């Protein structure tokens, strides 16, 4: 597929969204109106350009005769790898790749995958190298397994809040709890663990 110009991408997105919302393509007049073209003929010229680039087919003799040829693959869930200090967890530079996993397989639905580093949660089946499915939220409760950021370090632990302190418990007797004093340390909940994908068995 040849690259689309910014205006061609706008026209393509409008056609795609209109089909998704109404079940049918827009007319040339509707495209012109929504994108500020002077006339439906201008919309027609952009549609012809899209047809030449192979992303749509124009069906002659119909005002709504537009068929999409380019079916976009969903990106899937982003896989977060090593996280740089001071950067948001979902920053583009942290995303290693995307995996075609249905977010609705998890309850609540997953927003991203995090590669597990270490064996601190092995007793509940979260192993080194696993992909942890995470629902992005800051609304968590005692006893839940969460993804947290302490200062600039990201960790997966069982959450417990006691007064002004947070206790993050491992599921491995070899690891001591992490105690966070909210009055002195930076602490952020990045999300709730909602499932595990055993790395290597499904890829």
Curated annotation (Swiss-Prot):
Record protein name field: LexA repressor
Molecular function per GO: DNA binding; serine-type endopeptidase activity
Lineage, highest ranks first: Bacteria, Pseudomonadati, Pseudomonadota, Gammaproteobacteria, Enterobacterales
Reactions catalysed according to its record: Hydrolysis of Ala-|-Gly bond in repressor LexA
Membrane-crossing segments per the record: none
UniProt subunit comment: Homodimer.
Source organism, top-level taxon: Bacteria
Stored NCBIfam families: lexA
Regions recorded as binding DNA: 28-48
Originating organism: Proteus mirabilis (strain HI4320)
Residues the UniProt record annotates as site (Cleavage): 85-86
Cross-referenced InterPro entries: LexA, LexA-like, LexA/Signal_pep-like_sf, LexA_DNA-bd_dom, LexA_repressor, Peptidase_S24_LexA, Peptidase_S24_S26A/B/C, WH-like_DNA-bd_sf
SUPFAM superfamilies in UniProt: LexA/Signal peptidase, Winged helix' DNA-binding domain
Task of the protein: Represses a number of genes involved in the response to DNA damage (SOS response), including recA and lexA. Binds to the 16 bp palindromic sequence 5'-CTGTATATATATACAG-3'. In the presence of single-stranded DNA, RecA interacts with LexA causing an autocatalytic cleavage which disrupts the DNA-binding part of LexA, leading to derepression of the SOS regulon and eventually DNA repair.
Family listed: Belongs to the peptidase S24 family.
EC number, as in UniProt: 3.4.21.88
Active site: 120, 157
Keywords annotated in UniProt: Autocatalytic cleavage, DNA damage, DNA repair, DNA replication, DNA-binding, Hydrolase, Repressor, SOS response, Transcription, Transcription regulation
Repeat as UniProt keyword: no
Top enzyme category: hydrolase
GO terms (BP aspect): DNA repair; DNA replication; negative regulation of DNA-templated transcription; proteolysis; SOS response
């Amino acid at each position: 597929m040849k690259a689309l110009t910014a205006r061609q991408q706008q026209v393509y997105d409008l056609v795609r969204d209109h089909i998704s919302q109404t079940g049918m393509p827009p007319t040339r007049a509707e495209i012109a109106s929504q994108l500020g073209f002077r006339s439906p003929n201008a919309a027609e010229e952009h549609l012809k350009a899209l047809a030449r680039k192979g992303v749509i087919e124009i069906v002659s003799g119909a005002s709504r005769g537009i068929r999409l040829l380019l079916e976009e693959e969903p990106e899937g869930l982003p896989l977060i790898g090593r996280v740089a200090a001071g950067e948001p967890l979902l920053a583009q530079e942290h995303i290693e790749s995307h995996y075609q996993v249905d977010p609705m397989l998890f309850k609540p639905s997953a927003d991203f995958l995090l590669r597990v580093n270490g064996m601190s949660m092995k007793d509940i089946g979260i192993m080194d190298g696993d992909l942890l499915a995470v629902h992005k939220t800051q609304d968590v409760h005692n006893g839940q397994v969460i993804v947290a950021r302490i200062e600039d370090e990201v960790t997966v632990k069982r959450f417990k809040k006691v007064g002004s302190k947070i206790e993050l418990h491992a599921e491995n007797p070899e690891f001591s709890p992490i105690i966070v004093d909210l009055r002195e340390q930076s602490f952020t909940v990045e999300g709730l663990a909602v499932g595990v994908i055993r790395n290597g068995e499904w890829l």
